[in-house]
């Protein structure tokens, strides 16, 4: 006969009718309280993808840890780190959906950036040591607009030394904090849209809306802009307003993963899943395409390409597929 636990018994010397509100014979909270805490307040597996709004003065990692703790989330990850200076949208996934983040992080990102001219920063933003420029050149609106047009054509960018870019296995900022000179390689970027929102000629600052590709550093754009104008500049404030086509309207909503991918969807049945798990190709009559989202009901189970009406997998989430097949 199997052992059973009777929460209504007096095995722990408890008195009172409620299994969670009783006290011991000496008036201390009953052990039953701890069973209540364990069953109702332990961290739960809540699978979701959502957008959160990160405030200023906190790192993305710390913000996510606090959110996970508050919502009793066991495992969570985010895509597209925001510096502590910045606020705005952060793409977050939990449990198995964290595996999708590297694929979701390909979207363009839109920012509102406030830039101060006539000064420069060791980190290119307000978090570093800020120094004034001797005999600064006054920026005019015409000169600013011309420089923005030139900057929007940039296809390469050197990341800031105070960044998480890896150098010999360590983040660049690790060397920068020690005063060591390092050289970072330029990365490919694309500036899709540039709009000058506001320019204050008296205070020598401006607000710019930039839509950029993944990996683009807005503080590097601010520094480059200052140099183009034959002065210096730093990023004094930053807000991420959109990720792809998703803005603040989508905050705190649990979203279907397939709705976040800008890819053609290939819908599969159970038989297809079993064949793919065995490493077999399956016929799928559609136009040739290099990357597609593989869907079973509401689950993203992998990615694949279609060549000559044959589906060839690029990435399969095997454990997820096995779980589907076995249920």
Swiss-Prot record:
Gene3D superfamilies: Pseudouridine synthase. One of its GO terms (molecular function) is tRNA pseudouridine(55) synthase activity. Its EC number is 5.4.99.25. NCBIfam families: TruB. Keywords: Isomerase, tRNA processing. InterPro entries: PsdUridine_synth_cat_dom_sf, PsdUridine_synth_N, tRNA_psdUridine_synth_TruB. This is tRNA pseudouridine synthase B. GO terms for biological process: mRNA pseudouridine synthesis; tRNA pseudouridine synthesis. It is an enzyme of class 5 (isomerase). Responsible for synthesis of pseudouridine from uracil-55 in the psi GC loop of transfer RNAs. The lineage of its organism: Bacteria, Bacillati, Mycoplasmatota, Mycoplasmoidales, Metamycoplasmataceae. It catalyses: uridine(55) in tRNA = pseudouridine(55) in tRNA. It comes from the Bacteria. The active site is at 83 (nucleophile). Belongs to the pseudouridine synthase TruB family. Type 1 subfamily.
């Amino acid at each position: 006969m199997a052992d059973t636990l009777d929460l209504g018994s007096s095995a722990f010397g408890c008195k009172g009718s409620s299994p969670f509100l009783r006290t011991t014979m000496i008036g201390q909270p009953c052990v039953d309280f701890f069973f209540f805490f364990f069953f109702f307040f332990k961290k739960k597996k809540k699978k979701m993808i959502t957008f959160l709004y990160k405030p200023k003065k906190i790192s993305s990692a710390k913000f996510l840890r606090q959110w996970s703790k508050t919502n009793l989330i066991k495992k969570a990850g985010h895509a597209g780190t925001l510096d502590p200076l910045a606020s705005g949208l952060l793409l977050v996934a939990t449990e198995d959906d964290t595996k999708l983040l590297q694929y979701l992080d390909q979207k363009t990102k839109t920012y509102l950036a406030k830039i101060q001219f006539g000064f420069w920063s060791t980190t290119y933003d307000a978090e570093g040591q800020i120094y004034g420029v001797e005999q600064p050149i006054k920026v005019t609106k015409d000169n600013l607009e011309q420089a923005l047009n030139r900057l929007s054509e940039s296809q390469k960018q050197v990341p800031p030394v105070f960044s998480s870019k890896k150098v010999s296995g360590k983040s660049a900022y690790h060397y920068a904090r020690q005063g060591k000179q390092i050289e970072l390689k330029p990365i490919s970027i694309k500036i899709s849209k540039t709009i000058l929102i506001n320019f204050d000629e008296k205070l020598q600052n401006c607000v710019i809306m930039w839509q950029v590709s993944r990996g683009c550093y807005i503080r590097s754009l601010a520094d480059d802009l200052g140099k183009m104008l034959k002065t210096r500049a730093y990023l004094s404030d930053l807000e991420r307003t959109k990720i792809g086509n998703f803005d603040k309207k989508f905050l705190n909503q649990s979203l279907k993963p397939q709705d976040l991918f800008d890819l053609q969807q290939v819908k599969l049945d159970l038989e297809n899943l079993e064949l793919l798990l065995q490493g077999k190709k399956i016929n799928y009559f559609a136009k040739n395409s290099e990357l597609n989202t593989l869907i079973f009901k509401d689950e993203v189970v992998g990615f694949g390409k279609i060549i000559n009406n044959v589906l060839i997998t690029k990435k399969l989430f095997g454990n997820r597929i096995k779980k589907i097949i076995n249920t």
